[in-house]
């Protein structure tokens, strides 16, 4: 009988203040996070961004206790899912693979091989597919498979997205309903979906399905919510967490909050739709930054729907996804990691600067130019990095 491993994919997060810089470097080293036409620029740019953003990010993590709870919650989700699966007769072991911090994907793969797993179900903890989230994790897993004959022998099936799964939609609707009914005037409360943004070019140029899935998911949740409540709430959708000068999906969360407040909305129920675990973007960005913006613009009652974490119906839904995959649904890792033809990315592989003496020289020159430009801006107090908000 096949020994089943369920591999949960997630982003990862720094657990201590001193981890913030290395975490940011790992994040921005990923070509799916920042798409550059020249491979040699990726590492210097990641180093520069992590250097510039570390101080501000460290303050954000201090405001929520000094580190991200994402690993703890994800591992708790893994335990709950494993217990549920075994209770329904599926003898599976769950493993956690973080993309940018511990436990890394390599560690999870090593654990599965050591445990004698022969069949793997890959389940991203991102309901909505994007080339920068699930796509990046699938590609990293494919890279490991291509370089490991033992891992390549395993049967691997993947779940690409699950934004429309009934248990997920119902879980979200139930949690939103609780917050609406806790408002002073439930029927007048405004439901505000906020999703993690991606650059607009990902959708319009690269064919990323993320925006369509977010919009469709919001409508599914609203429809179920209305059926449950018996009345209709106004609602809107926006995108948060943009980085850098590039245009991201609009409207932006902070701008919509200002408009809602000025339009007379007093009771707001904020729904972090693309997050299934509490982490920096719910606990700090929404609960602190966006709450302050809302209150400054006249919103009196600001309620935030909690992340799903280990909500029982949500765990049941994850188990159903695993069960369906074991029964023939799901797709191959090759298909899951495949990008639209319009996406131009260099291979996602571990690499050292330089492949020969000439390239070493050019890599050094690029790094020196970046470093000197950074120092010059610090000295004169102005320049492109100041203009785009990195300094």
Curated annotation (Swiss-Prot):
SUPFAM superfamilies: Chelatase, Chlorophyll a-b binding protein. It catalyses: heme b + 2 H(+) = protoporphyrin IX + Fe(2+). Pathway: Porphyrin-containing compound metabolism; protoheme biosynthesis; protoheme from protoporphyrin-IX: step 1/1. GO terms for cellular component: cytoplasm. PANTHER family: FERROCHELATASE (PTHR11108), FERROCHELATASE, MITOCHONDRIAL (PTHR11108:SF1). HAMAP family: Ferrochelatase (MF_00323). Catalyzes the ferrous insertion into protoporphyrin IX. This is Ferrochelatase. It comes from Prochlorococcus marinus (strain NATL2A).
